[in-house]
Amino acid sequence: MGYRKLGRTSSQRKALLRDLATDLIVFERIETTEARAKEIRKVVEKLITSGKKGDLHARRQAAAFVRHEVVEVVQVDAKGKDGSTVKKNRPVYALQKLFDDVAPRYAERQGGYTRILKKGPRRGDGAPMVIIELV
């Protein structure tokens, strides 16, 4: 099975795919070149499928690939030292969003979690641009 080199060394390519896959999970829609989008699609489909399994092994495999990035900060109630209720800020990470929000959304779907929409050429170099989004 082939893959695109994307004009980079293997470590640079892996870092690029990690960053773009994490951004797609966080924002659920990104704009990139067509070749990159087709490669990200493979990675994200596998991540979401492992997210649907939801076991510890799947979570650890996804954690090894997805960047440790804060998606949002939510306020939760917690008990203070004196027993009173206080509000605390708790970060929500990309991995947590993948397993708690994105994967359950596709519980009944067997693959095909992403959509690629063609946008037109980039102004600077004419590279074909697309929007890749979660369905």
Curated annotation (Swiss-Prot):
A Pfam family: Ribosomal_L17
InterPro entries: Ribosomal_bL17, Ribosomal_bL17_CS, Ribosomal_bL17_sf
Keyword Ribosomal protein in annotation: yes
GO molecular function: structural constituent of ribosome
Gene3D superfamilies found in the cross-reference section: Ribosomal protein L17
UniProt keyword annotations, A-Z: Ribonucleoprotein, Ribosomal protein
Biological process terms in GO annotation: translation
GO CC terms: cytosolic large ribosomal subunit
PANTHER family (alphabetical): LARGE RIBOSOMAL SUBUNIT PROTEIN BL17M, RIBOSOMAL PROTEIN L17
Quaternary state and interactors: Part of the 50S ribosomal subunit. Contacts protein L32.
HAMAP family membership: Ribosomal_bL17
Family: Belongs to the bacterial ribosomal protein bL17 family.
Protein's name according to its UniProt entry: Large ribosomal subunit protein bL17
